[in-house]
Amino acid sequence: MIVEPKFRGFICTTSHPIGCKKNVENQIEYVKENGKIEGAKRVLVLGASTGYGLASAIVASEACDAEVLGVSFEREAKGKRTASAGWYNIESLKKFVEGEGKKFISVNGDAFSNEVKSEVIDLIKENMGKVDLVIYSLAAPKRKDPVSGEVYSSCLKTVGAPFTSKTLDFHTGEIQDITINPATEEEIEGTRKVMGGEDWMLWIEALKEANVLENGVKTIAYSYIGPEVTYPIYREGTIGRAKNDLEKTAGEITKVLKSLNGEGYISVNKALVTQASSAIPIVSLYISILYKVMKEKGTHEGCIEQIYRMFKELYEGNLNLDSENRIRIDDLEMAEDVQKAIEEIWPQITSENVFELSDAEDFKKEFFKLFGFGLEGVDYSEDVDITTV
């Protein structure tokens, strides 16, 4: 069938298999051009199908020549409904890696569940022995507590007081004022349960108990801080509370891994167009301005550039750590001259000048690319088989 983008709000409900494959190939190409990294050899990536998790799986496999086990929860094609972009991404990467004669194991299931943890541990024992790097990059709207069975939901709200600011509807290019209401205590706790560090710790404890962690193992979870303009909705909101919990967990994990000389790290990454960030009010406008400023300065990076740099710093022993022991690969975003330029543009921006003062057009293009649309070298008028890549 011929696949075209279809939308429900900020969610694209279709994905293009050949476009997703091309997107993965472009990232692989970047890594190959930049050379090998002497690093991890057996890697578990939790949340391996999109964004930073996908980039981590690609860098591990292609730069480090590591065996990779990737866990994701994606939708296969059914009837006339395409698979999710993540499903095509993982299939594309798996085919490519196996074509090179390397190992890539994928598990499609709920990483929050005990069943998937057990399945992954068995697969590590059978195929890899032990892993020396665990990447934690899960993003989900809900999580079922594996002990109590209670289902928790995450939400995107402020804490304490409502907050009004500008946001961008990137479909229309309109700048609108938006008010975000404060969360209840229940919503704050729900977001922490889904997006905090609890499940990361459960994974590390289960892997350690099963004796599938290598001596000197490292584990990294991804976070974001950003500038003050986004604080009320992000860092000081429900998501920020969850990220604080995630960051606190890194130190606790280092204690758990002490007997293995292991370490838990948080990597604070750059703001990028992802399925998650495009739905966050205010952040979409901030990213559009950020992209324009960083491109003009020649410092712009996407997921793959960020993660390649992080792996290189991690394994070459020159990590950029802050006072709280967090890896800072958001350093180019948070550079004083970049943030000063954004602060100057922010109050001036309107629906009339948004395409001139920001990179709103590119935000839209990048968003479409997440689902395999708008990539060079893909004929979108062709009939495609939506069940495979």
Curated annotation (Swiss-Prot):
Pfam families: Eno-Rase_FAD_bd, Eno-Rase_NADH_b, Enoyl_reductase
Residues binding NAD(+), per UniProt: 47-52, 73-74, 110-111, 138-139, 243, 272-274
Coiled coil: none
InterPro entries, per database record: Eno_Rdtase_FAD-bd_dom, Enoyl-CoA_Rdtase_cat_dom, FabV-like_NADH_b, NAD(P)-bd_dom_sf, Trans-2-enoyl-CoA_reductase
Residues that coordinate or bind substrate: 224
Residues forming the catalytic site: 234
Domain of life, source organism: Bacteria
Top class in the EC scheme: oxidoreductase
Catalytic activity from the UniProt record: a 2,3-saturated acyl-CoA + NAD(+) = a (2E)-enoyl-CoA + NADH + H(+)
The protein's annotated pathway: Lipid metabolism; fatty acid biosynthesis
Any one GO BP annotation for this protein: fatty acid biosynthetic process
Entry EC no(s): 1.3.1.44
Gene Ontology molecular functions: enoyl-[acyl-carrier-protein] reductase (NADH) activity; NAD binding; trans-2-enoyl-CoA reductase (NADH) activity
Keywords associated with the record: Fatty acid biosynthesis, Fatty acid metabolism, Lipid biosynthesis, Lipid metabolism, NAD, Oxidoreductase
Transmembrane stretches, start-end: none
Residues with site note (Plays an important role in discriminating NADH against NADPH): 74
Known role: Involved in the fatty acid synthesis (FAS II). Catalyzes the reduction of a carbon-carbon double bond in an enoyl moiety that is covalently linked to a coenzyme A (CoA).
Subunit structure: Monomer.
Family in the record: Belongs to the TER reductase family.
Protein name: Trans-2-enoyl-CoA reductase [NADH]
Gene coding for it: fabV
